[in-house]
Amino acid sequence: MFGIFVLSANVGAQEVTSKEIFSIPEPTWIFNSGMSKGKNHDRQDLGFILNENTELRMRQTNAHFKNKLKLRLLGNDKKNEKSIEVGSNWVSIRADEPLVPFIDTPYGEGSAQIEYEVVTSKEMKALPVYKYHGNETMFFSMWDTEDAEYALIQGVDFQLLVPKLDKELVRNLKDFPSIDALIEYHHGIFALFNGIAGFDGSAPENQNGANRYFLKADDSGAGAAYYGGDWTANSEPTTDMWLKELSWATLHEIAHGYQAGFDGQDMYTGEVSNNLFGVQYQYEKYGKKADDIGWLFNLGKKEEVENKLYDKLSRDGDTYHDVDVREQLILLTMFKQKAGNDSFTKIYQEYRKMANQSDFKDWEYTLPNLMNRIYSENSKQDFSAALKKRGLYLDEFQAEKNRVAGYPAVASLADIVSENELVRARQLIDPNYLINSNFELVTNEEIASLGLAGDLTIEILPSDLSNFEGLTVELKDGATIIASQPVQQKMTFKNIPNGVYHLEFSGEQMKYYLPSENYVYVKETQNHASLSLIKADISKLADEDLIFYGFNDQWSGSLRTNLNSREATLTLNMPKPHYLFKDELYVKVTIKSQDGKIRYEKSIYGDIPERFTDDHLLLEIGDSIEIYHAEARNRLKGPENLIDRGQNTNHWLVTEHGLKHLGLNNNPEKDLMIKIEKLGNSLVKAEGIKPMAWERSMAKKQLWTAIQSLSPKDTEHYMSQYYVLFK
């Protein structure tokens, strides 16, 4: 990583100059995971500044190098910058103002060779370049002597193109004693971010890439700053953002490149999850002082931020989807902190490993499910209740795995302690965590010493099961049974310690019924929970998810079927699915009854804002579903045999075995058998669930129900194959 100050010679006029352009290995294992990480940022300067209205001619001369190069003229305003592809034939480029020529670093093994000439009688100014451990005096002497419009600062992880108007800012850095210290500051950011993302060399997919970020100014940039495909920039003519130590924008924009393919999958994280990197950086570096100088609590306005979040979540019943991006960040920070930073890193590493498999399907790995599985299994705590409390959709099978493993459930402090006891609870809990909030996650054991307890009344709502004879319900904290009672229409558990508990029903009849809720919350008050016991007539294995993606392949929404509940859920979680489809229909969902009457219709336009939607719609066997997607070829996703990518409009018939595509004519019963075998084989191998009583296991009930829906011959076959699960 060490270099010296580079004193580039002036480029003479009408001289053909040769230069080798080195290549770097393409880190496909990173890009395959949906992480851009400065993918097209790395570039090589030519050592000079091209004068305004001056022609630069270039060609590539290595016959063994087959790809074209990208030549760019860069400055501090993209509207004035130029670019052109360079092949074996001479090409020309010029600009209306002095700009710096760069060649984008190609990916591959072989180097390229360029020849270029500047068509002018004037000499070009040399580009001052400072590398780590260089000579600052010589660097500024050259910058002053040349009166260069730009200079370049290079580190091992990044390059920073600095305009002349910032020369004195660099000469007299306010937050750093030297340019080396500035480079070390940025290197520290990249080093931590690489560690968070799991680039530790522990496996081939955990190697870091060799490409560098490119940092600059852009007076025509969007917003205050932005991360883009070719660079990341301060949206002003100055690079002052990159020269400050306490620059949240620096952390925020760099971290955008570390967002992976799981981001935004079934929950909005676009301007949120990158900030998890910035939060960890600030709290690791500054400790609790980050409450006052960091972005998480709005630069010292913690009480105001916390009060607003409490009002939304605890008083108004809002979910993750309803609160603003800072509040979403607090919630994600609390999840991450409780699971441990290593659990967050494990999400990255496991996802990269999966994403580099040939049969990988990104839509199958939603962020809520990844968090629930990896956070729970890595920390040996059950995150299911806490995630569902925030309105996130979870795979029921993973939630059961957590419970069977005996993991204690975690909950936000504000969800298990009343407002008038929060101060005392915080005094107990806060010293144990670096980042504190009313919504920090705790186990029941952590608050037990408060001595708080309340009564819990559980009401079984009128449903499919009305005779409760022989049924028992247990209130459990992890593997520990706190209390149990015979099931009645209304039951009260007295003097239960504050906390979150899971319910476990048993009894012969429960082989065929499913509770609508699995978790209950207790505060030091009178607590009430309502749930239904629902007959499992149609297995969850028959359900399908149809996913709508939008601009930049972002998850925009989904239609999920729940055939046992006779409903479909339409979820929309992108305000504008695709802004380029201005005033154009982008997605349309229609549900029709068997006689052709429209039950539901929703039109979604590309650039018209939509509020977060989570609509539960009536869906009966025999109904039809129609989805129009303007980019169905690659942005309507689901099982391969359920999506006709050659048609923008897809039609399905709802059957008891699942969806039948009316164009592709898949066999829903055969599709269901594949799912039966996948679940059945996994349960046979599951040490915790395999010996578990059928009546206590949701997964076994779903498997049994699916098997019973088949033909007598197939039912007999699968009951014999998975007999060990039901004996």
Cite the ranges covered by each PLM segment:
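Beta-strand-rich domain onsets/edges
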Residues: 439-455
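Compositionally biased low-complexity segments at domain edges in trafficked proteins
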Residues: 128-159, 528-565, 656-698
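Pan-zinc metallopeptidase signature
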Residues: 14-19, 28, 331, 336-430
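Sec-dependent signal peptide cleavage junction
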Residues: 7-14
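Bacterial N-terminal signal peptides
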Residues: 1-6
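Catalytic cores of extracellular degradative/oxidative enzymes
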Residues: 141, 149-340, 344-361, 371
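Beta-strand-enriched, solvent-exposed domains that form extended recognition/catalytic surfaces
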Residues: 14-131, 455-644, 654, 660
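Amphipathic, non-membrane alpha-helical rod segments
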Residues: 503, 679, 683-725
